[in-house]
């Protein structure tokens, strides 16, 4: 069949030829490929019978690859020989292909190259290329695949029918090919294992004959083929599992090739071939690109044995990813485990001296020059053995040739790694000279060895070691394994792109770039950064001459590569290289010092070393001594004579001496005569003697000669199996049996050393050379025939079952060419030998095109092999995998390989074929500047005007890269034909584009040339137009040059007349082009040529704006110096500063501000630079702007503030910065923070910090407000990854709230919060501790004890817990005793207890500190100054109000309103707080808490919010309309939705909910006891206010215990009320809203009767609260409460001193207007924001009202005093208060009284003041401090302390106040209401009438209306502004005015409201009068109330 098909082919018949669908450069689909391969296998495997189609010539592509064709065979080849003759010839020559024996072999038994490959690749099979591993886990081809270079897995006969493994994943990167290459390295242990059983199997097969043995043997041979692993013990790793680790870059298939100097570059093919590399290419094929898919991939199916092995590999233990670079495995047979190293210390000493010299011309390295066998390799190996890589010597040193491989102990330490000793393989011999000298020389050697970081051996018979890519890869792999360079290794692991850069694939494509960027530059940078030791490092390279044997046609050898790269080496990286004397010229370009080892006569040290070696050998062997002694004795004379004789013969060759002594030692030489005639005279004679002894007859040598021929011809070491198969490949009849083969190989074992990877290597390069080449006059006996070896190897490749991989195809071509078996046949047959060779290779493999386009053959092409592949049918237009799948011609044109280009063009390659980017070969050549290739292509009519996909022609590419000669040539080319065809693109267009291209790149010569072209009319060539823009980029020459900063070109163009103002196609003039890029020198040039520095572009932007936008500081400064206007705006109203802020360029911002740029400029959208900076997100710019006066609360036209923008853009650093600078958290802020957990954490943490700050200062109520508000704002869902953070934060907030509640005597809530914290964090000892303290405070000692025991379990070493545990145990005992002695203690006891508690572990701050661990650390760290989010710290440091403001701006306006109004706005808030907090510590609690509940609201946080806090504001804090308050009211219509602000809260938890919560709190024995038993209540812990008051007044403890009780009860009731808010009366009674107010008053009175002032304060606070209901919580009628309230108010008033008021500038409250407001507040507080009173009286009133900052101080202080009491009360008033307070905002922060609602809470008369965080820091502090009984003025106003307590708050005596209050109880309440306009408005709620206190925004419509008018003005926008601005609206001028107007107007609305609510009005009026009187009295009193509303109300 084959003969027939051959005939068909020769006659031109296409006998069913299978084209491999190669036309398009794509291989046939896998299925077709499969069939063709299968058919091939069947052809050779099944009896050798194959169909014609199988054997038909299969060109890779449809294009006939050979001249042979059907019609014109004769014409091209001349008269052909007869078909039979030609066929016979081919059959004879190729008969081996069809050997009959083959027919007997079952297909499964056939040896296939693929199987071999499998074996080769098995080790690598499971490995991935370094790069591919990084990107995907592509496995390299299965070991059985010819594509893989892994050693084949041993298989039995049945295993042969293997199919290829599945194709790797398509995701593999280009690097995937490397896996093959690198994979070729395998593990020693694996190979050992494999070869063991492979060998056994092969023996069995051997007896069977046929080819079976090949398979098994081959497999083991292959396994040895590429065998190298630094990890000897490691077995193969699964490629899939451990991709990177396994790629051993060891050159798997060592190429054994013939030395160059013996033949003219016989192994040139090696340059392009390296199995690994091919694998590399093969891996590329795996990339599933149709054109690149490997044809063999899908084929062989795995056989059993193979599968087992795979499994074994797959389950290898996992190892973490490692560097993907794997060093080559070097093994040097001449360095054995028995080698001896003697002397030569002088060499190391000289090397050391030279490398350390200061002479830069020689200190970069040393060249060691010597003849073959003179010890160069031993010197290098000695240094390696002593270096950090010494453990690798076990790989380098071979086992002794005489040791049986069976006995090799892979784990044995090689002597090379140890210090020289008698037993060491390389021992240092005695060296002449003094011991000191030897010591120094020894030190030099060890110093050098310690500096060695990498090494490389070049071995001619292992081609891979001679190739530059492998060299680079190996050196990098060893460098990263050097202990001195761990930083380099870490960098490679850290930067995978560096590993990719060093992958074998990258090294093949551009070894110089890989070495420079992957090795030298990283090392240099690490050295500069001092990350690697500051010392010299050495790279060793042995045998540079050997690498020359494999010099590629194109590309570098290792020595030429080093010559080019040495200039880039850092001074501390040295080289030590060796070279043979005969080839030392190749190193002449290396600037190294040279040391010669063969100048024996010149160097006495050499003689001494030889002498020492001879002495060592004689003394170490008795056999030698016996054989050289004449009479059995060795005397000095004999020794001297012998030594001299041997030294003379050796001429310095240690190899000669070693081999000679070996012969003597074994008895082959006996020197009994003194003539020594038997001693061989040269190394050649030594080898001859050895062979004569080994092969005494010619026939015995002939038996092994084929083995030697194959070994000599191979490019890399082969395994026994491979050699066996190659030998049998040449036999047509009767194959060699395995046993016979093994016997022959055993005879060669001393010459072919088995390496650790089971491959065979010649014992020494010199022996290999001796076998193939002899000098003249030498005997030619034992000469081998390399051609025969090439022939056998070619036959062997041809007999592979499947398709060869790329590398194997290249190798096959190499061997075919070297074999040249058709030599002389062409004349006989009439067919040229080259065509026959082409036929041969085409029959033998399918992947010719892929081999031609393989990576190595592209970058280091082998011209001859490439020609052979093309003759065989390779597709010359095949698309490669590089340069965008460019055809081969494109790649060769790009690389400048003229010969390859000519070859491709010769065979008709498409001259205009383009890559995927549209670039043709002409474009690539022009871009690279290869004029010769451009000329070649143009001669072939390449299209000059072809445009790539970027629209660029070849001329433009040449101009872009500055190739003037190419530009000139292309312009002179004929463009007419192309132009006519395309029509559109003309030569003039190309020239214009070339001008712009050259100008942009700064090529002045090309620009000048193009501008000087003759005019069009003069010649055909058209000159470029200097002011025109091109059709490609749309640039003019000047805009292009200016934009790229090409100053010289700009000068040239301007000199040539370019127009300065000529715009490009987009309308940009040169000035803008250059400013945008920051080239100020060109700006200067253009300005000097008349450009306008302030010209504007289409958008109105000036050059200064452009430069600022781009961040070019130098250009900005230059433009400013040139007079650029800093104030100009573009069409959007943006200035240069705006642009700089928008882009975040701090340096430019600083420069512009320093030059006077306005930081407050607003653009057309109202955005200031701060807004834009917050949008961009640069915290430093934001900080700078704020520090330089930018308005932090500025609102743009869309209602956004900088903080809101930062939150919206998720710029966390800016958010933190703005919060630190005092930005307020408004509703918009919360809204924008939705779904942004990171921002929410920041905002909540900010609230928590504020709370912590207040807590530290003792302002418990304010702190609780913050915490409560934060809890209210907690996101309900979507925590995601931040769940843990949020949980911790919530736990912290709950615990802090618990502490605050406890300090406020709200023990039930305290306990509840602690319980909730425990639910969230069951193992929290802090939560147990907090709950225990709460329980202890409520006298639940047993329960407290249980919690403490749990806490101590969780934290046994906490002293606080231990201390409290002891106390509680003691208390339990006392209680038991008391119970035994007497009935339960009267209610008073609790108070006693309370004081105790307070005094005990709980000093005011103690709580925080006791459990401070977490909370303080996490939240207290921030500066206290930052506490107030809303207010500027400086304005009211002490006030929580500012903070409150931000809280009020909680996402929901209502919420904010709620917060501000009820919690902050009114005492209710505080009461509510206690209630709500009590009610539900959780959300419910908070929600229900609504304002009151959340301590945050109650706290100054909310006070600060007052501006926005005011009910309206809060309700609609951002809505700007009071109605929101109403809206909130809507939600809880019953009472003026006191929850008003809390509307949302209430929604979340309906009032009922809150009620229940409060109830539960009330339920707590304390609270409810309070309600039930007033008398007890006093004793019980009081509300925070009362508690605080208690502390100061405990001693005095007024008889008013009842009021205190009331207070306490009120908290409980208040809470209840809260929930019940609808019925204000109930609230009053429960909470004692009025009671609260009154209650507070009472409790305060009771507590502080001694110091009435304080009591007054508390009372006044109570009054606010109390106003809610007619009946006070304690049960007193509202009148009573009022009385107490008024008394409180009076007290407060009185408490205020002029000094106090002044202390707080009115501006603190946003202006004096606030004070003026105050007076009005009396009547219409609720309705409007009142500016500060203008008149003194007003001021006083204000102060009494607490409206003024001073008042706020007072308020604050009272707050701190009464917070506990207030807490209880607020809950009650809360309902009304909410609604009412919504109406008014009195918080100091708020400018208007409308803040009253806030104020209410903030301002409770004095109590409210205490509760409210009014900026009065001093007052506040005092109040805190003065809590102690010592200061009578605990009332809360700074001056109060000085005043005697007898003076009531407003200067009215307590009694008077009470009296007035009682009569006006309702009025007073109302007055409270009046104070807060809301109160009046609240009338809608039942308790509102009496509840003036409830400042809830106008509950009544009238209130609302009024509120809308006044408050809206203020609350609406003003409120918002207030909310935003720390000083409040009043602070802002216009806003202040508005507030003033509002406040003034408010009186009328108040009246209106009063009318609406006559009763309320009456009360209000009365109250107002009283207040007026009080205020007058207050004025009389030392304190002049500056506070507007609170105190007046009181």
Swiss-Prot record:
Record GO biological process: dense core granule cytoskeletal transport; in utero embryonic development; regulation of dendritic spine development; regulation of dendritic spine morphogenesis
Bias kind Polar residues: ranges: 418-431, 1473-1502, 1557-1576
Subcellular location: Cell projection, Dendritic spine
Keywords carried by this UniProt record: ANK repeat, Cell projection, Glycoprotein, Methylation, Phosphoprotein, Repeat, Synapse, TPR repeat
Sites where a glycan is attached: 1932
ANK repeat residue intervals: 846-878, 884-913, 917-946, 950-979, 990-1019, 1033-1062, 1066-1095, 1099-1128, 1132-1161, 1165-1194, 1198-1227
PROSITE patterns: ANK_REP_REGION, ANK_REPEAT, TPR, TPR_REGION
Sequence positions bearing Phosphoserine: 169, 238, 294, 400, 1446, 1462, 1534, 1549, 1583, 1726, 1828, 1831
Any Gene Ontology CC annotation: dendritic spine
Pfam family, one: Ank_2
Composition-biased stretches (Low complexity): 1787-1802
Gene3D superfamilies cross-referenced by the UniProt entry: Ankyrin repeat-containing domain, Tetratricopeptide repeat domain
Domain of life: Eukaryota
Task of the protein: Scaffolding protein in the dendritic spines which acts as immobile postsynaptic posts able to recruit KIF1A-driven dense core vesicles to dendritic spines.
Family statement: Belongs to the TANC family.
Assembly mode: Interacts with KIF1A; the interaction decreases in presence of calcium.
Protein name per the record: Protein TANC2
High-level lineage: Eukaryota, Metazoa, Chordata, Craniata, Vertebrata
């Amino acid at each position: 069949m084959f003969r027939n098909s051959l005939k068909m082919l020769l006659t031109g018949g296409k006998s069913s030829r299978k084209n491999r669908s190669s036309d398009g450069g794509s291989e046939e689909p896998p299925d077709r490929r499969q069939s063709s391969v299968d058919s091939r296998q069947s052809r050779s495997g099944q009896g050798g019978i194959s169909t014609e189609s199988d054997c038909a010539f299969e060109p890779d592509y449809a294009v006939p690859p050979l001249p042979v064709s059907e019609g014109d065979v004769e014409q091209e080849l001349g008269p052909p020989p007869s078909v039979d003759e030609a066929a016979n010839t081919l059959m004879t020559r190729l008969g081996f292909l069809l050997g009959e024996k083959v027919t007997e072999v079952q297909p499964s038994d056939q040896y296939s190259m693929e199987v071999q490959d499998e074996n080769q690749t098995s080790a690598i099979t499971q490995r991935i290329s370094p790069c591919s591993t990084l990107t995907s886990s592509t496995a390299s081809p299965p070991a059985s695949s010819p594509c893989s270079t892994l050693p084949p897995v041993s298989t039995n006969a049945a295993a042969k029918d293997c199919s290829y493994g599945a194709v790797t994943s398509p995701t593999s990167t280009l690097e995937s090919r490397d896996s093959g290459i690198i994979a070729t390295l395998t593990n020693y242990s694996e190979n050992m294992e494999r070869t063991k059983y492979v060998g056994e199997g092969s023996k069995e097969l051997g007896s069977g004959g046929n080819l079976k043995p090949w398979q098994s043997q081959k497999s083991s041979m292959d396994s040895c083929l590429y065998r190298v692993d630094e990890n000897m013990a490691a077995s193969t790793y699964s490629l899939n599992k451990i991709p990177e680790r396994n790629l051993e870059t060891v050159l798997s298939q060592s190429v054994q090739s013939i030395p160059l100097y013996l033949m003219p570059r016989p192994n040139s093919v090696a340059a392009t071939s390296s199995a690994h590399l091919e694998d590399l290419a093969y891996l590329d094929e795996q990339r599933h690109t149709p054109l690149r898919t490997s044809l063999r991939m899908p084929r062989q199916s795995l056989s059993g044995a193979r599968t087992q092995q795979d499994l074994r590999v797959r389950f290898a233990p996992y190892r973490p990813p490692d560097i993907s670079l794997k060093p080559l495995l070097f093994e040097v047979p001449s360095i054995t485990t028995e080698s001896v190293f003697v002397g030569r210390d002088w060499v190391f000493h000289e090397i050391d001296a030279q490398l350390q010299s200061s002479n830069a011309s020689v200190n970069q390295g040393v060249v060691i020059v010597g003849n073959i066998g003179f010890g160069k390799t031993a010197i290098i190996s000695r240094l390696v053995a002593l270096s950090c890589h010494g453990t690798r010597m076990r790989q380098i040193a071979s086992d002794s040739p005489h040791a049986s491989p069976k006995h090799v102990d892979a784990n044995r330490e090689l002597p090379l790694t140890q210090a020289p000793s008698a037993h060491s393989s390389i021992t240092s011999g005695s060296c002449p000279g003094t011991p000191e000298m030897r010591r120094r020389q020894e030190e030099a050697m060890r110093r050098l060895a310690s500096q060695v970081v990498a090494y490389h051996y070049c071995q001619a018979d292992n081609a891979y070691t001679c190739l530059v890519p492998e060299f680079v890869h190996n050196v990098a792999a060893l460098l990263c394994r050097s202990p001195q360079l761990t930083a380099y290794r870490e960098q490679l692991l850290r930067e995978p792109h560096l590993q990719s850069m060093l992958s074998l694939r990258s090294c093949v494509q551009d070894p110089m770039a890989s070495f420079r960027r992957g090795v030298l530059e990283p090392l240099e940078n690490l050295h500069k950064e001092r990350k690697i030791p500051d010392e010299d490092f050495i790279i060793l390279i042995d045998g540079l001459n050997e690498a020359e044997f494999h010099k590629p046609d194109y590309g570098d050898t290792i020595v030429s590569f080093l010559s080019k790269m040495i200039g880039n080496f850092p001074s501390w990286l040295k080289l030590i290289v060796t070279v043979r004397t005969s080839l030392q010229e190749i190193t002449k370009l290396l600037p190294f010092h040279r040391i010669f080892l063969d100048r024996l006569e010149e160097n006495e040290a050499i003689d001494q070393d030889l002498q020492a070696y001879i002495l060592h050998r004689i003394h170490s062997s008795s056999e030698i001594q016996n054989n050289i002694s004449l009479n059995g004795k060795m005397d000095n004379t004999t020794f001297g004579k012998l030594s001299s004789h041997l030294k003379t013969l050796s001429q310095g060759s240690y190899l000669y001496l070693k081999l000679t002594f070996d012969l003597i030692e074994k008895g082959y030489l006996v020197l009994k005569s003194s003539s020594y005639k038997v001693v061989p005279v040269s190394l050649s004679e030594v080898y001859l003697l050895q062979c004569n002894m080994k092969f005494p007859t010619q026939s015995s040598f002939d038996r092994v000669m084929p083995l030697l021929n194959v070994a000599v011809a191979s490019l890399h070491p082969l395994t026994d199996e491979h050699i066996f198969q190659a030998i049998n490949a040449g036999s047509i009849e009767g194959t060699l049996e395995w046993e016979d083969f093994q016997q022959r190989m055993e005879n060669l074992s001393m010459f072919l050393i088995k390496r650790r990877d089971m491959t065979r290597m010649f014992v020494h390069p010199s022996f290999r050379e001796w076998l193939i080449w002899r000098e003249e006059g030498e005997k030619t006996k034992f000469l081998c025939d390399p051609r025969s070896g090439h022939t056998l190897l070619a036959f062997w490749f041809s007999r592979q079952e499947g398709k060869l991989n790329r590398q194997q195809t290249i190798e096959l071509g190499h061997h075919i060419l070297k074999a040249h078996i058709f030599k002389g046949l062409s004349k006989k047959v009439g067919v040229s030998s080259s065509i026959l060779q082409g036929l041969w290779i085409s029959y033998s493999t399918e992947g010719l095109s892929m081999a031609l386009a393989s990576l190595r053959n592209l970058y280091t092409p082998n011209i001859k092999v490439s020609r052979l592949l093309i003759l065989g049918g390779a597709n010359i237009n095949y698309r490669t995998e590089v340069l965008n799948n460019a055809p081969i011609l494109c790649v060769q044109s790009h690389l400048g390989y003229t010969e390859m280009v000519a070859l491709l063009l010769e065979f008709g390659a498409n001259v205009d074929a383009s890559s995927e980017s549209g670039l043709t070969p002409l474009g690539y050549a022009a871009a690279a500047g290869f004029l010769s290739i451009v000329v070649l292509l143009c001669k072939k009519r390449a299209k000059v005007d072809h445009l790539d996909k970027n629209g660029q022609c070849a001329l433009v590419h040449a101009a872009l890269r500055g190739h003037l000669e190419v530009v000139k040539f292309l312009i002179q080319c004929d463009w007419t034909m192309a132009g006519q065809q395309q029509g559109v693109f003309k030569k003039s267009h190309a020239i214009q584009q070339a001008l712009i291209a050259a100008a942009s790149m700064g090529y002045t010569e090309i620009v000048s040339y193009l501008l000087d072209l003759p005019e069009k009319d003069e010649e055909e060539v058209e000159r470029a137009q200097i002011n025109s823009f091109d059709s490609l980029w749309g640039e003019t020459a000047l805009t292009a040059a200016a934009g790229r900063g090409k100053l010289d070109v700009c000068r040239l163009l301007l000199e040539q007349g370019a127009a300065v103002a000529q715009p490009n196609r987009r309308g940009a003039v040169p000035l803008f082009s250059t400013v945008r890029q920051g080239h100020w020198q060109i700006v200067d040039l253009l300005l000097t040529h008349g450009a306008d520095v302030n010209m504007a572009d289409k958008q109105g932007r000036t050059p200064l704006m452009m430069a600022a936008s781009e961040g070019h500081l130098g250009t900005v400064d230059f433009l400013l110096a040139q007079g650029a206007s800093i104030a100009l705006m573009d069409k959007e109203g943006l200035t240069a500063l705006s642009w700089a802020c928008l882009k975040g360029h701090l340096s430019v911002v600083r420069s512009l501000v320093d030059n006077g740029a306005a930081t407050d400029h607003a653009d057309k959208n109202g955005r200031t630079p701060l807004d834009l900076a917050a949008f961009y997100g640069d915290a430093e710019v934001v900080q700078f702007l704020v520090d330089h006066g930018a308005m932090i609360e500025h609102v743009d036209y869309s209602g956004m503030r900088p903080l809101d923008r930062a939150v919206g853009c998720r710029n966390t650093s800016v958010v933190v910065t703005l919060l630190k600078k005092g930005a307020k958290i408004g509703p918009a802020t919360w809204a924008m923070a939705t779904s942004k957990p990171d921002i929410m954490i920041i905002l909540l943490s900010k609230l928590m910090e504020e709370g912590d700050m207040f807590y530290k200062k003792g302002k418990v109520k304010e702190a609780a407000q913050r915490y409560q508000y934060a809890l209210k704002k907690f996101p309900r869902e979507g925590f995601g990854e931040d769940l843990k953070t949020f949980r911790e934060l919530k736990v912290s907030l709950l615990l802090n709230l618990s502490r605050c509640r406890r300090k406020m005597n709200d023990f039930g809530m305290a306990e509840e919060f602690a319980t909730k914290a425990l639910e969230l964090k069951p193992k929290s000892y802090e939560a147990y501790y907090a709950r225990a303290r709460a329980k202890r405070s409520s006298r639940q000692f047993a329960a407290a004890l249980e919690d403490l025991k749990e806490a101590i379990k969780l934290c046994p070493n906490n002293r606080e817990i231990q201390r409290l545990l002891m106390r509680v145990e003691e208390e339990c005992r006392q209680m038991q005793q008391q119970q035994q002695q007497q009935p339960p203690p009267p209610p008073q006891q609790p108070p006693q207890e309370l004081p105790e508690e307070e005094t005990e572990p709980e000093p005011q701050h103690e709580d925080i500190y006791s459990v401070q661990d977490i909370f303080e650390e996490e939240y207290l760290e921030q500066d206290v100054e930052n506490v107030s989010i809303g207010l500027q710290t400086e304005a009211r440091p002490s006030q929580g109000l500012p903070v409150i403001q931000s809280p009020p701006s909680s996402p929901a306006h209502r919420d904010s309103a709620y917060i501000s109004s009820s919690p902050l706005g009114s005492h209710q808030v505080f009461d509510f707080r206690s209630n709500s907090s009590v009610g539900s510590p959780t959300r419910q609690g908070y929600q229900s808490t609504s304002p009151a509940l959340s301590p945050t609201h109650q706290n100054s946080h909310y006070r600060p919010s007052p501006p926005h806090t005011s009910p309206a504001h809060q309700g609609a804090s951002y809505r700007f309309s009071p109605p929101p308050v109403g809206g909130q009211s809507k939600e809880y219509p019953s009472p003026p939705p006191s929850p008003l602000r809390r509307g949302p809260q209430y929604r979340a938890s309906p009032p009922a909910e809150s009620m229940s919560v409060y109830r539960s709190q009330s339920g707590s024995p304390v609270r409810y006891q309070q309600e039930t038993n007033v008398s007890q209540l006093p004793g019980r812990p009081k509300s925070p206010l009362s508690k605080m008051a208690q502390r100061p007044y405990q001693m005095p403890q007024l008889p008013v215990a009842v009021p205190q009780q009331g207070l306490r009860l009120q908290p409980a009731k208040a809470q209840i009320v809260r929930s019940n808010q609808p019925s204000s009366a109930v609230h009053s009674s429960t909470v004692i809203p009025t009671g609260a107010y009154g209650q507070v008053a009472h409790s305060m009175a009771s507590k502080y009767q001694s110091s009435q002032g304080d009591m007054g304060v508390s009372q006044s606070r109570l009054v606010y609260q109390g106003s809610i209901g007619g009946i006070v919580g304690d049960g007193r009628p509202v009148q009573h409460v009022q009385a107490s309230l008024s008394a409180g108010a009076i007290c407060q008033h009185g408490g205020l001193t002029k000094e106090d008021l002044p202390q707080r500038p009115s501006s603190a409250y946003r202006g004096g207007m606030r004070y003026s407001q105050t007076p009005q507040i009396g009547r219409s507080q609720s309705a409007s924001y009142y500016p500060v009173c203008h008149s003194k009286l007003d001021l006083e009133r204000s102060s009494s009202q607490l409206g003024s900052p001073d008042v706020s101080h007072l308020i604050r202080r009272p707050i701190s005093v009464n917070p506990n009491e207030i807490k209880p009360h607020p809950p009650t008033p809360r309902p009304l208060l909410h609604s009412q307070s919504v109406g008014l905002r009195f918080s100091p922060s708020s400018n208007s009284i409308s803040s009253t609602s806030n104020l209410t809470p903030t301002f409770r008369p004095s109590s409210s003041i205490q509760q409210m965080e009014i900026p009065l820091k001093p007052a506040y502090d005092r109040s805190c401090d003065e809590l102690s009984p010592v200061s009578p003025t605990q009332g809360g106003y700074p001056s109060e302390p000085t005043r005697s307590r007898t003076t009531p708050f407003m200067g009215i005596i307590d009694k008077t106040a009470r009296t007035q209050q009682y009569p006006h109880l309702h009025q007073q309440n109302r007055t409270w209401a009046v104070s807060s306009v809301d109160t009046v408005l609240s009338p809608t709620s039942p308790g509102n009438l009496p509840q003036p206190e409830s400042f809830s925004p106008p509950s009544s419509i009238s209130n609302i209306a009024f509120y809308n008018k006044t408050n809206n003005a203020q609350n609406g926008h003003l409120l918002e502004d207030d909310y935003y601005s720390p000083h409040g609206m009043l602070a802002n001028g216009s806003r202040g005015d508005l507030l003033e107007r509002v406040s003034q107007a408010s009186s009328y609305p108040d009246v209106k409201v009063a009318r609406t609510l006559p009763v309320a009005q009456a009360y209000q009026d009365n109250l107002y009068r009283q207040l007026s009187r009080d205020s007058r009295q207050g004025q009389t009193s030392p304190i002049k109330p500056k506070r507007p509303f609170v105190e007046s109300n009181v």
